[in-house]
From Swiss-Prot:
Domain of life: Bacteria
Pfam families (UniProt xref): Complex1_49kDa
PANTHER family: NADH DEHYDROGENASE [UBIQUINONE] IRON-SULFUR PROTEIN 2, MITOCHONDRIAL, NADH-UBIQUINONE OXIDOREDUCTASE 49 KDA SUBUNIT
Enzyme class (EC, first level): translocase
Main location: membrane
Organism: Neisseria meningitidis serogroup A / serotype 4A (strain DSM 15465 / Z2491)
Annotated localization: Cell inner membrane
Catalytic activity as recorded in UniProt: a quinone + NADH + 5 H(+)(in) = a quinol + NAD(+) + 4 H(+)(out)
InterPro entries per the UniProt record, alphabetical: NADH_Q_OxRdtase_suD, NADH_UbQ_OxRdtase_49kDa_CS, NDH1_su_D/H, NiFe-Hase_large
Gene Ontology cellular component list: plasma membrane
Protein name: NADH-quinone oxidoreductase subunit D
Quaternary organization: NDH-1 is composed of 14 different subunits. Subunits NuoB, C, D, E, F, and G constitute the peripheral sector of the complex.
Enzyme Commission code: 7.1.1.-
Amino acid sequence: MANKLRNYTINFGPQHPAAHGVLRMILELDGEQIVRADPHIGLLHRGTEKLAETKTYLQALPYMDRLDYVSMMVNEQAYCLAVEKLAGIDVPIRAQYIRVMFAEVTRILNHLMGIGSHAFDIGAMTAILYAFRDREELMDLYEAVSGARMHAAYFRPGGVYRDLPDFMPKYESSKFRNAKVLKQLNESREGTMLDFIDAFCERFPKNIDTLETLLTDNRIWKQRTVGIGVVSPERAMQKGFTGVMLRGSGVEWDVRKTQPYEVYDKMDFDIPVGVNGDCYDRYLCRMEEMRQSVRIIKQCSEWLRVNPGPVITTNHKFAPPKRTEMKTGMEDLIHHFKLFTEGMHVPEGETYTAVEHPKGEFGVYIISDGANKPYRLKIRAPGFAHLQGMDEMAKGHMLADVVAIIGTQDIVFGEVDR
């Protein structure tokens, strides 16, 4: 009886350091060439959609931060926009500028993590160290406005939790920092938050150039990314790819331009688009997107400096009154009590609201039955569609290229598994 040749099957993850969380993939190999890549998901499923249906609209907000835990505030933004659309809430213009500014800060945070970890997985260690240096400063912005460095819960239906602070947290002296280092670290933290943001926007483009020096013309980086994971424009659209995964294939689609929300229609920025649809082009798109985000942040900062005003709606059925008013007015106290015990009542209806998330189109679909909780909440996670393309993108490549493809998809399992 003749022996039958069989392909070799291996498990990739979920413990693998390049699996970006808890991805388990069953790879079928012919030698070292991939015949089939089968992603198994669900290991980080926490029932977010169902949990949100048991909470009031305000209580459900912090769950959004924990979906894509690298792009926290953009998740919040999509949810808040959906609730505002259903309830017909008018958001003050200053709050819209603050939201857009922090959405772009979040985009830079995401791309630094994406590029840094992608390079690290492939074998270039320096990039992630540079990326985390800049991420540290941006996370200080999160901390200054919300008190948290990751799960901010800063956006609210109707605006934002509070206005921008007049100061930035400073480094304190320790046995690891001498007086000279401490002075350098705190130099840009002497003024307001907007001063800190402007100083960051001045020096960050040079830091992007440094990252590019490490990778863009690096021979090994190009060998590992050029021609790997190619997706044609037609196939990208058929697969439901969005964000950099779609733009890297040459399709100019960005929700901020095609269906503008908040104040994006007042912003001057460009959409970087790839040509070849491979890992290298997607990397270049992310690099350029960070530069465009800096442009948007500068425009927001400029506007916020000269336009004071309210940062949350004055309709107390949806947002709490100021604490000073609450301590003197009985009606304000009642509004506060009702809002945090019973929650806001959103009129009957349904809506799908999408934002341009750093990873693609992040959508929130809400059905309201007029109660204080969503009747149904559905989340459209961009990474879910991208991961489905894994088999097609990896087929015919070598085992080592799987790591490059996972990195270019920029997968985070909080949103994929929900």
